Amino acid sequence: NDGGQFEPRLLEAMKYSLLSGGKRVRPLLVYASALAVDQCTELTDSAACAVESVHAYSLIHDDLPAMDDDDLRRGKATCHIKFDEATAILAGDALQAIAFEWLSAPLIINRDIQSHVFLGKQLQCVRILAKSSGYMGMVAGQAIDLAAIDQTLTIEQLSRMHNLKTGALISASIQLGALSTCNVNEFQLAALEKYADAIGLAFQVQDDILDVTTKMGILGKRQGGDIANKKPTFVSLLGLEGAQDKANTLYNEAVYALSDFGKSADYLRDLATYIIKRKF
């Protein structure tokens, strides 16, 4: 708070959605990718906060009656159930806005040359996050998802949808982490992009698997939600065993993309393992 007025109920809804648990995979990917190429900086912290805030906003809006109409998220009432629909919409709007406020905030950099370099990095990070979360990324994926209800998709169409809806923000997290450091080269960025493409899709495949194999008490949301909403999933297209094979293939692709990094990318490897082994 910068001393201005704010609406307490709106702030409460924002905190409820941003701080009420979750896996924090996206900010962890920011830090892990930064450590893979160099050291974390103040911009790394800003990027981690920003991607999680965008993710929280997207969940609020996804859960709304006009979208997925869910009443349970992370084992708790969804934002529009806990508060009301209008407050939930505004909380999502505000969380999206504050993400870019954090990402573009002035950095405390001691050396002038770093200050100049990091201003350019901030602008690049803002552009990446905006593109990945907007009409060419996450929002596009959600639009395709809504249009796919009661439709039959090919595996290629389903993959494209989730590359946008889920993978775009995961890819942005990894790019922002690497760019937030003092030293990263184009070869490293290209390898991290391949890792991001594979692990972003693997995340969604595992989500589809958990949707049919994990009980609500562990999953934190209603089991079989996508099937109930008549949405195509990797399990519905490939079967459970086929979806598990798909997740393992994507995991191997992600780990292979990190071959040239050595031990500095161990956190990214660990996160890849977690993503396909998780139970919620």
List each model region and its residues:
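Mg2+-dependent prenyl diphosphate-binding active-site environment of isoprenoid biosynthetic enzymes
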Residues: G4-L258, S264-I276
